[in-house]
Amino acid sequence: DDEYYKLILPIQKNLSKKFRANRNSPQPYIVLGALENPTIDKLSPILEKILKPYKKFKVELCDSVCVSETTKTVNLKIEHIGYIRKISRVINDTLKLHGFNILNNDEDELAISLANVNYFNKDKKNNSEVLYDSNKNNKTYPTLKVDRFEIWKISNSRRETLIKSYPLRNF
């Protein structure tokens, strides 16, 4: 959601600077899976049917930062991932039943990708540090609203292209 993007923008800039990431960082996103050579004409109606009953929801961030070597991204882990995990599981199971090949199915490690990096400093990998100023007794982390699911194509030149967007229903 664009409104909640403003909340995470300072965190994104701070992490981009700390990990020497690309200055043109993408809007934060949560990767639910990657498909190998999907047929979009076959995939689109399946996803529309799966996502039709779901409403917009929120995810709570935690202060744990991780760096993914496979996707070359700096990620911020998500707390209380029950609802998004349920959606991810339904999508992955349904796509497997329809014959799609899902490459990375890390349901336990859902995180928000904040920045793309080309070089990894070994000391900064799997770093956990406090990113927010909060009361010691009442620790609250920012929550972000998920208002749509999107299909992206990543080409060999590392350019990301939006193929289709699936907006979620209002509350």
Tell me the role of every PLM-derived stretch.
Residues 1-60, 81-140, 157-171:
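Basic, often amphipathic N-terminal segments
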Residues 60-62, 79, 147, 152, ...:
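A structural detector for beta-sheet-dominated domains
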Residues 64-70, 144-158:
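Glycine-rich beta-strand-turn "strand-cap" elements at beta-sheet edges
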Residues 74-81:
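Short histidine-centered catalytic/ligand-binding loop motif
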Residues 73, 111, 146:
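Short hydrophobic/aromatic beta-strand or adjacent loop that forms the aromatic wall/cage
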Residues 76, 144, 166-168:
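Generic detection of short hydrophobic beta-strand segments and adjacent strand-loop junctions
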Residues 74, 151-153, 163:
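Generic preference for hydrophobic/aromatic residues in regular secondary structure cores
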